Amino acid sequence: MKKSLLIACLCFLGMVAYAQKETKVSIETEYGKIVMLLYNNTPQHRDNMIKLAKSHFYDSTLFHRVIPNFVIQGGDPQSKHAQPGAMLGNGEIGYRIPAEINTEDCHIRGAVGMARDGNPKKESSGCQFYIVTGKPATDAELDNVERTRGAKYTAAQREIYKTQGGTPHLDGGYTVFGQVIEGMDVVDKISAQACDQNNRPTKDIAMIKVRLVKKKKKFLGIF
C-alpha cells in the first residue's frame, strides 16, 4: 500500500514538473492570434523569448520580411516607428544568443527560429525571429540536405516535410526553438500580403501584443 502510494506521488510530482516546463507565447495581430510553444532543449532561446515577452519588447514591432512559401520574420526594434517603404532587418538588441541547433528540431511548417547574420558560430539574433511557412519537400531534396548537414532525418521528419512542408535547407544553420500550435491560418494570411521589392509588406503588419500564455491550473480529484 505504502509503495503504491509512493509511486503515485512520484508520478504526480513528475506530471507537475512536466507541466511547469511548458511555455507558450501568444502574438496578437490584426489577422488574429498566433500561439507558439517554446522548446525546452533550447533553454537560452526560450528564456530570451520569455524575457522579451515579459518586457513587452515586441509590442508594435512589425513583421517586416514576408516571403510566401518560406517565412514571415519580425522583431526588428527599428520597425516600431519605421517610415513606409524603409528597409528593415538591421535593428538589434545589442547581444547574440549562442547557437542551440538540434537535429530533432527541424524547419517544418510552423517552426519558430531565430534569425542571424553570417557569423561563423551561427549565433542567433537577440530579438529577430521567423515562422516557417515553407512548401512540401521531395525525398531528393531531403537527401541533399542530409549530405550537407551530415545528419539523417527520421522517418517521421521526412513524412512531415513531404506532406506538410517546411524549409529543410535551413536545417543545421539556424536555431529552431519553438513551434506554432495555434494560428497557422493567421501566419498564412500574413504570408499572403502584398510586399515591396525588399519583401516588406506594403501595409504594416504589427505584433500588437506579445505575451506569455498563462498556465491554466489543473486540479486532480475523485468525482
Where are these regions (language model features)?
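Positively charged n-region of N-terminal signal peptides that target proteins for export
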Residues: 1-4
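Hydrophobic h-region of N-terminal signal peptides that target proteins for export
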Residues: 9-18
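Cyclophilin-like peptidyl-prolyl cis-trans isomerases
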Residues: 17-223
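Hydrophobic positions within alpha-helical membrane elements
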Residues: 7-8, 69
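A periodicity- and composition-biased signal for non-globular, repetitive helical segments
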Residues: 8-9, 79
